[in-house]
Amino acid sequence: MNIKTGGCSEDCSYCAQSSRYNTGLKASKMVNVESVLEAARIAKENGSSRFCMGAAWRDMRGRKTNLKNIKAMVTGVRALGMEACVTLGMIDAEQAKELKDAGLTAYNHNVDTSREHYPSVITTRTYDERLATIKNVSEAGIHVCTGGILGLGEKPEDHVGLIHTVATLPTHPESFPVNALVPIKGTPLGDSQVIKFDAILRTIATARLVLPSTIIRLAAGRNTMREEKQIMCFMAGANAVFTGEKMLTTACNGWEEDKEMFEKWGLRPMAVEETIQGQQEAAEKVKVDLSKVQASEFSTKAEASL
């Protein structure tokens, strides 16, 4: 869900939300907490296990009120029994800690492409600044969600470079989103050719080999693929999708459409208790229950000795 639309100061060549381009998108203030939680409830009712929230701005500097509201959104989403993910641009170590304390499951901050091709796409934020945010997120104990966009005018070796960057992080990310550029009129990449499907498939398959435990998420551009192509992506190694009304500002496959596809091809959506967050919480519960048993045994022994 886009919790704050447009008006971003960055110059990402692919993005409709940049204030530098005339895309017809109207900027808006951040939505209220309750509207986010209502959207999360609907997502859960339709089978989603994770709710993702994105805000269009460069970073979180000077946004204390926004951060307070976002933490309330995160806590509220978690109270619904869902995982919570946000993408808020660059954040520092203290902001990452605050989000972790609020219950944040994952933080999305894509590296977008290879280090070599990156300057051709964005000039207002460096590659190393992106990696610094990923480091802050990881060190705060939040799961990292980082991937890229295919179709930015890159070469095949840039797909290798993208995967190499992610695979050589100190710890492999929990999630690797694979986006296919949706050209938006008014942006510098608005007239770009659509990326060939075999490039998407090769990227997914390669990522699966070098990131064996990472969730590979089909993200933007999936709605442009025919059903059989989406299934080929799953066969190549993808094992999650973004679904719902919109993928930030671009169209997204709907819940009913995805449910029909999953049922047709024998794909079972992951239950909340099967997610990484769910498994961790189950493990913590076991620890708590075990400590109670041990405390009870100690108390019984103490009484017997008396």
Located regions from the model:
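Local cysteine-cluster metal-coordination motifs and their immediate loop/turn environment
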Residues: I3-S19
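Auxiliary Fe-S-binding modules of radical SAM enzymes
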Residues: A167-L306
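Glycine- and other small-residue-rich loops at beta-strand/loop junctions that grip anionic moieties
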Residues: M1, L88, T126, G148-G151, ...
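Conserved Radical SAM active-site core
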Residues: R20-G147, G151-T168
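Glycine/charge-rich, flexible interdomain linkers and switch-proximal surface loops
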Residues: M1-K4, E94, M225
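Functionally engaged cysteine thiol sites
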Residues: C8, C52, C85, C145, ...
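Short coil/turn connectors at secondary-structure junctions
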Residues: S9, N46-S49, L80-M82, P212-S213, ...
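Hydrophobic faces of well-ordered beta-strands that scaffold small-molecule active sites
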Residues: M1, F51-M53, A84-V86, Y107-H109, ...
